[in-house]
């Protein structure tokens, strides 16, 4: 069966997350239904990142096996047409044929996320549900310096959800940068894989540094505590974006 690699963009606001669930409409549901209307097949998609409810993506990666050998452009345009007709907030940006051994999840070498904080006194209008609104002025430089304490391999128990199903809390963090961009404070983070709620836990804890309630040493102590109770608040999902996934090429 021909395998296809899809790059997908979506607004996570109306969805219960990426993964198909019984309690609501998921991004996976939306795309699988569009494929069903296109080719008449009941398909199961596999994604690089199983984003939570409200989390957005500009470059989610998915693979799917089809019975017929369709042209990549035909797949993209036909599935997008059905997504538009269904009023879904999902777009297939690119489709390419790939090898049978490519797996969107398990072949990934790195995942890249962006967390956006809208940092001004006035509330959000255009970017409502697209960024976390924090009124108090944040010291982005202090946040960036503190974030260096989290780089490398650590036991990130403090920064993972209590219901996280990962076998080990140990992960290697390759990048964690914080910069100010006008009224926004942006956190960019990269690793091969992440724990459940890890990025949002970083954002909430670094916000504590930004407003002056925590120092870099406090963040270090939270990391070393290996205790979920030591974490700062978990930032809301709507500020988080999956912005890229890296693979070895050729697949």
Curated annotation (Swiss-Prot):
The protein's Enzyme Commission number: 5.4.99.12
Keywords: Isomerase, tRNA processing
Gene3D superfamilies according to UniProt: Pseudouridine synthase I, catalytic domain, C-terminal subdomain, Pseudouridine synthase I, catalytic domain, N-terminal subdomain
GO biological process entries: tRNA pseudouridine synthesis
Protein name stated in the entry: tRNA pseudouridine synthase A
Active site: 52
Leader sequence residues: none
